[in-house]
């Protein structure tokens, strides 16, 4: 028998045994490399996770700051709007006694006397022009009667029995009230109707 013809006890040629062993080693190597994790890969994965977490925190922080800035901008706009709307409040409050004086002068003036007609007309025109000016700036007069009492714009001075006006409604105006852009700057002093006993 030659060396080529030599058979192993299992009946395989030596080349076949080497090939089989080589295939077994190749089959084992991928499993071994899958089980072995490179520490650099672990470190990279850990760093990537930390980076993602840091990016999320930064993104959240930026969004939070943007939201705070937007809220601050809105509040500032509202404050400026209110300042524009109600900047005249002090000035209007100083004018109200003048308007009241003109109203009282008209109430007590003797309109039947022809000698007083020019003065009454002058007071009426002065009052009208003053009210027109303050209306341009958002001031409205509260002087309606026979309307339900509204504690936001009326201050009840007295209750008076009445057949003509429903109970709880404004019967008379003692002093006119005023609003500035919808906000009451002086409530109207009124008498309120009540049912007769």
UniProtKB/Swiss-Prot annotation:
Subcellular location: Cytoplasm
Gene Ontology terms, MF aspect: adenyl-nucleotide exchange factor activity; protein homodimerization activity; protein-folding chaperone binding; unfolded protein binding
Record gene name: grpE
One GO cellular component term noted in the UniProt record for this chain: cytosol
Subunit comment: Homodimer.
Protein name in the entry: Protein GrpE
Organism: Escherichia coli O45:K1 (strain S88 / ExPEC)
PANTHER family in the record: GRPE PROTEIN (PTHR21237), GRPE PROTEIN HOMOLOG, MITOCHONDRIAL (PTHR21237:SF23)
Alphabetical GO biological process terms: protein folding
Protein family according to the UniProt entry: Belongs to the GrpE family.
Family matches, as InterPro entries: GrpE, GrpE_coiled_coil, GrpE_head
Region entry Disordered, spans: 1-39
Predominant location: cytoplasm
Keywords, in A-Z order: Chaperone, Cytoplasm, Stress response
Protein function: Participates actively in the response to hyperosmotic and heat shock by preventing the aggregation of stress-denatured proteins, in association with DnaK and GrpE. It is the nucleotide exchange factor for DnaK and may function as a thermosensor. Unfolded proteins bind initially to DnaJ; upon interaction with the DnaJ-bound protein, DnaK hydrolyzes its bound ATP, resulting in the formation of a stable complex. GrpE releases ADP from DnaK; ATP binding to DnaK triggers the release of the substrate protein, thus completing the reaction cycle.
Gene3D superfamilies: 3.90.20.20, Head domain of nucleotide exchange factor GrpE
Signal sequence coordinates: none
């Amino acid at each position: 028998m030659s060396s080529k013809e030599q058979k192993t006890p299992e009946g395989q040629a030596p080349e076949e045994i080497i090939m089989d062993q080589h295939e077994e080693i190749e089959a084992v190597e991928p499993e071994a490399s899958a089980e072995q994790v490179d520490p650099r890969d672990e470190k990279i994965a850990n760093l990537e996770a930390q980076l993602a977490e840091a990016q999320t925190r930064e993104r959240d922080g930026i969004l939070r700051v943007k939201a705070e800035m937007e809220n601050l901008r809105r509040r500032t706009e509202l404050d400026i709007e209110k300042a524009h709307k109600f900047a005249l409040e002090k000035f209007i409050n100083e004018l109200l006694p003048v308007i009241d004086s003109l109203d009282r002068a008209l109430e007590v003036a003797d309109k039947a006397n022809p000698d007083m007609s020019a003065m009454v007309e002058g007071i009426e025109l002065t009052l009208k022009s003053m009210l027109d000016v303050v209306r341009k700036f958002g001031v409205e007069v509260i002087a309606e009667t026979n309307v339900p009492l509204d504690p936001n714009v009326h201050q009840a001075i007295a209750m008076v029995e009445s057949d003509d006006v429903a109970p709880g409604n404004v019967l008379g105006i003692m002093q006119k009230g005023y609003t500035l852009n919808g906000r009451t700057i002086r409530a109207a002093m009124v008498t309120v109707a009540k049912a007769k006993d």
